[in-house]
Amino acid sequence: MKPVYYLAVDIGASSGRHILASMDNGRMTIEEVYRFDNGMINDNGNKLWDVDSLFANIIEGMKKCKELGKIPVSMSIDTWAVDYVLLDDNDKCIGNVYAVSYTHLTL
């Protein structure tokens, strides 16, 4: 029986990683398949998360799984700091994604 793969994407304050887990004969194995830098953009003194870069790196990690021939049946993304991004009707970001603590006041 072929192993079944599950992809976890962990995005931290300074880097992100794609971890592929599989179950084979009752044994779990994990491997890091992709890693990328993460950081903030300074926009006129405002610290912003580079959401476009994060999204591009998530896609690159998924491509790496395909290159390895290890296609996950499910995927989960874990981040810290930004709890939400507002989207319009076309699923595009509305405004910037600020990397500051006062954004909790917008809810």
Show where each model-derived region lies:
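Acidic, proline/serine/threonine- and glycine-rich low-complexity intrinsically disordered segments
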Residues: 99-101
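Conserved small/polar residues in nucleotide/adenosyl-binding loops
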Residues: 103-107
